[in-house]
C-alpha cells in the first residue's frame, strides 16, 4: 500500500490555494499518494487530515509573521499572512503530537521551529 502524504498548501490568496507541482511530482515519484491539505479553520478537520495521512510535507512560501515568535515586524520583511501562519502552526503541532513523519522545507522549517517555541532572526 502506498503512503498518503499530506502536502500543506504553500500559497494562498482570496481566489485560490496552491502547491508547486514539483512537490506533488516528488511524492508520486517516491511512490506516495499526494493529498493536498487546504487552509481550514476547524480543529476537527485538522485532526481528520492528521489521521488520514501517513506523513506530511510542509513546503516553502512567504515569511512567518514576526509577532508569532515574539518580535515586531521590521522594515524590509517579506510579505506575511497571519491566517496561513496560524493554520500551519496548529497543523504542525497536531502532526508532531501524532509522531508521524514530517519533511519541512524552507518556510516549513520555520513553521516547525516556531511551533516548538523557537524564534527566527529576521
Predicted regions and their residues:
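N-terminal beta1-alpha1 cap of cysteine-dependent amidohydrolase-like domains
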Residues: 1-105, 113-115, 121
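Catalytic nucleophile loop
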Residues: 109
